[in-house]
């Protein structure tokens, strides 16, 4: 557990480490008076100019940050996975986007998997929050990537949610690492998921399907 203060805002971060698990979870709690939470809206691509000078590469947008990693190198392959609920309205419940990290851009999703293209080793960010389109105090994106810098954004709380008399939880964040094989990133994520809840094989080791259909409404 780590505590620190930013002016009148108190921050508590609780880290969870599990045996034989390549991931560390972090839960963040806030208390106090605050007017410094980062606010940011995604820059419209039409407002961006051609890069002709060094200054043109600087994008000074701020955002509320859950976690951030900075690495050397410019060869990072990224998968960003976004989930959807509300199956009455959404038929495609998983969307995966693959990209090479370049200039600063924003991405939506709960899971960011990053692989270094030379060593082939990688890491993941898991944002423990609802689907992007139903998150609280949502700023339009969940991750930022710029070359070897990767950030998890969006606390799930606004200034009015934070009070001096109690700890207010923000969304959780998990950092995990994995090896060069394609299956390694799946094993690393699943290993963490098996730590946070009791696994009952007869209940959990199965695939279920929604068979409601129209719930026989047409036959009435």
Which sequence ranges carry the predicted segments?
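Carbohydrate-recognition beta-sandwich/jelly-roll modules
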Residues: 1-220
